[in-house]
Amino acid sequence: MIYWKKRLLCLLFSLTLRRQSKTIYNMKKIILFSAILFWAVFSASAQNKNAQVVTWTTAIQKVEPHNLPPAPYLEGNSLRQIVEVSFGGNMVSLKLSNQYNTEETEIIGVELAKALTQGESAAIDESTTTALTFGGAKGITMKPGEIVVSDPVKFRMTPRMDVAITIHFGKASRTDVSGHPGSRTSSYIAEGNTNDFSKAVETTHWCYINSLIVNAGKKFGSIAVIGNSITDGRGTTTNHQNRWTDNLSKRLLANKKTKNLSVLNLGLGGNCVLRGGLGPTANSRFDRDVINQEGVKYAIVFEGVNDLGGSWNGEETAKQLIESFKTMIKKAHEKGIKIYGATIMPFKGNNYYNESREKGRQQVNEWIRNSGEYDGVIDFDAATRDPQQPDRLNPAFLFENDWLHPNADGYKVMGDCIDLKLFEK
């Protein structure tokens, strides 16, 4: 009897140990699963918190001979360029482009600082000067065609702040430059590797700078605007930042529902959609300048007038433009980007005008307004045309009587006519 009692006790003890062992094993699985789940949530949260969004950018092209940097040129010298950001941030990276160069460009050093005079001078708040690094190094040599991004650095930017980007060059070509001719903002070239710009030479072009990228939260995003000289700001006031995109940016920042959106001006003077024109066509650069920009949530397409202005058959060109716009819309939607079409403004009085080209303009605008292909419409035509003669610009908005580009008042009307609800979705 005692024997069987002992056997029974041993059996019960063994079962208890197995249950405890199984419980411990299950607890380990629960703890491991919880740890994995926590890591995944934390990682996703960190990625959202540190999502990269562009707060300023420009469209890069091969700089034409008449827009190249003046003497003393860039090699061995320092270049200070001023840009105005949309929203601010505390962790910033700079993208530089050597995309159209056939030679190497040597960068000895780069600094960011707060600019003090909106580009009217090279003055900076020296206490804000922050050196950038590239893979931990002070400088970098960009290979032909290369685009590089600096390491993120702590640098406080506030909304609409003017940032001075100072580049110290080693080897740099005089005639082979990637940049943006229509900066509408002053830049300054000083001799030598220096931060003394008191005797600097002033120019109004950007060279090599491409984007300022902010580590921002998931609530932040950007509106990429692809366009021609009317987006680039032909007719605005140098250093006043009064393009229509600037006005839109100010309105967005003042609206609680849209204050976390940057406006990226990717206009190029003389740009075409289909072929010819200045710089890469809108068709060829759409991926680079819109789809692949960090943080893009919305896009605006405002192109076509230069294609029509150089066409032999306005209605045939209109058909080709519409097909190109359909392709852009498809690409944007595949990336989850809402895309809006802007109507082509009138140009009677300019040498672009003839009846065939006007018919083409009306054809494109009719499609933009009524096809339903775009996610929304921005009607610049209606906002800027002469009420008495709708095939020409309102005379109050003329720049130098060219009957193509608006003046500062016209650009303000353009920025004001855009419904901000398009960007509250």
Protein language model features and the residues they cover:
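N-terminal secretory targeting modules
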Residues: 8, 12-26, 44-226, 236-239, ...
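Solvent-exposed loop/turn segments at secondary-structure junctions
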Residues: 100, 172, 229-233, 268-273, ...
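Structural recognition of the beta-strand scaffold that forms the well-ordered cores
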Residues: 222-227, 231, 261-267, 297-303, ...
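Catalytic nucleophile-elbow at a beta strand-turn-alpha helix junction centered on a G-D-S/GDSL motif
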Residues: 220-246, 269-272
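Catalytic His-Asp segment of secreted/periplasmic serine-dependent ester chemistry enzymes
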Residues: 309, 345-425
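Oxyanion-hole/transition-state-stabilizing segment in secreted/luminal serine hydrolases
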Residues: 236, 268-320
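Sec-dependent N-terminal signal peptides
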Residues: 30-39
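Phosphate-binding active sites in nucleotide-utilizing proteins
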Residues: 240-270, 283-284, 289
